[in-house]
Amino acid sequence: MENLETPVRILVVDDEPDIRNILHILLSSRGYEVDEAENGLRAVECVRAQPDYDLIILDIMMPGMDGVAACTEIRQHSVAPILFLTAKAQPADMSDAYG
């Protein structure tokens, strides 16, 4: 019998290629369909083109458009859950992420 379920689609956004690669390997090995973006602007472009992601993993600290600005733009096109990935750990950083 053919599996009619569509795979879960995840967008991984990070300016560090090694981080994107690790997440891609881990997630795709578990059956997730993974797209990658190297910065916030590219993430927004991906979501505009395909707003039906099931999850977006978004780095906060990126050159150009950071993760917080990208999140604001993404929210205009998608209701996908966004998981922030960051090395920042201060309470003010969490406040910034939640807007």
Question: Each predicted region: which residue ranges?
Answer:
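Two-component/phosphorelay signaling modules centered on CheY-like receiver
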Residues: 17-35
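Active-site residues of response regulator receiver
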Residues: 14, 59, 86
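Residue preferences within the helical output face of two-component receiver
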Residues: 43, 74, 96-98
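Non-catalytic signal-transmission and effector/linker regions of two-component phosphorelay proteins
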Residues: 1-11
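Conserved phosphotransfer cores of two-component systems
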Residues: 48-51, 73-80, 89
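Acidic, metal-coordinating helix/loop segments flanking the phosphotransfer/catalytic sites
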Residues: 11, 36-55
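Receiver (REC) domain active-site loop signature in two-component systems and cognate sites
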Residues: 62
